[in-house]
Amino acid sequence: MFKSGFVTIIGRPNVGKSTLLNHIMGEKLSIVSSKPQTTRNNIQTILTGEEYQIVFVDTPGMHNPRHKLGEYMVKVAKESMNEVDVALFVTTPDVEVKRGDLHILEQLKSAKVPVFLVVNKIDETTEERLAATLKNYSEAFEFQEIIPISAQKGKNVDKLIELMVKHLNEGPKYYPDDMIIDKQERFIIAEIIREKALRFLSQEVPHGIAVEILQMKEENEKYKIEATIMCEKDSHKGIIIGKGGEMLKKISQSARKSAEKFLDKRVNMKIWVKVKKDWRDSPFVLGELGYKAPKK
């Protein structure tokens, strides 16, 4: 019997949702950064086995939105919970149930799907703290499955996959065997550039940046990519470019290497920086960048 279904991965920012997905898929498919709300779009990645196909919906973290982009991210996260077969609630072994977790669990109560408690980063805690965490979270919500893991080390990840398959129903193969993501290459390249910018800029520039791919074409076994990093302030533009252009050069070089690894071809990459004030509150700009503005 072939089983298939959709699984959403949800939790507070920085609990390791993207790291978990990356380990399962063996590819850097979801942007990984230490900054909250670094996943913006609803990305579907596909894991196909001999007797199953799991379509993962990697959603933005739940938070209180402060602009239209934030509203979009929260809307995507909430909608995904009503369209899946299993929800993985990922948290960390902090003993006490966090306020942010209580907010998400309250949302999950109305989802009417099996919810797994996935306690990540068990390699960074003690057995006593882990046991206390499992006890407190079990009392706060009725989970179908409880599994402690280390997404970074891969501990218990195979067991987690087995449990997901167990809860899926008989169903069709939604995607071809060799398909692992439902986004186009341009989207992935834009995410790679944005991830590098977030990583190198540290706390100097917040989340007010986006990446637009102006051109991406393949010629003679080589890709030519031109992109713009969009920011909200002139001061941010200066920081992104850096003294003598050093910061932008660092971002470009690192992004180019990752792009070459992803595309498996040589890449010629040029990146510019453009100021677009308050772009996160502009429905038009959000639409141009692929973010649909939430309906009122």
Swiss-Prot record:
Q: Where is this region: G5?
A: 149-151
Name the residues that bind GTP: 11-18, 58-62, 120-123
Give its localization.
Answer: Cytoplasm; Cell membrane
* SUPFAM superfamilies, sorted: P-loop containing nucleoside triphosphate hydrolases, Prokaryotic type KH domain (KH-domain type II)
Pfam families membership: KH_2, MMR_HSR1
Any idea where the KH type-2 domain is? 201-277
Q: Which residues form a coiled coil?
A: none
Q: Which PROSITE patterns match?
A: G_ERA (PS51713), KH_TYPE_2 (PS50823)
Q: Where is this region: G2?
A: 37-41
Q: Where is this region: G4?
A: 120-123
Bilayer topology term: Peripheral membrane protein
Show the segment(s) annotated as G1.
11-18
The UniProt keyword set, sorted, is:
Cell membrane, Cytoplasm, GTP-binding, Membrane, Nucleotide-binding, Ribosome biogenesis, RNA-binding, rRNA-binding
Can you tell which superkingdom this protein's organism belongs to?
Bacteria
Q: Which residues form the Era-type G domain?
A: 3-170
GO terms for molecular function, please? GTP binding; GTPase activity; ribosomal small subunit binding; small ribosomal subunit rRNA binding
- Region annotation (G3) maps to 58-61
Question: GO cellular component annotations, sorted alphabetically?
Answer: cytosol; plasma membrane
> Biological process (GO) annotations?
ribosomal small subunit assembly
What do we know about how this protein assembles, alone or with others? Monomer.
The role this protein plays is: An essential GTPase that binds both GDP and GTP, with rapid nucleotide exchange. Plays a role in 16S rRNA processing and 30S ribosomal subunit biogenesis and possibly also in cell cycle regulation and energy metabolism.
Family, per the entry?
Belongs to the TRAFAC class TrmE-Era-EngA-EngB-Septin-like GTPase superfamily. Era GTPase family.
Q: What is this protein called?
A: GTPase Era
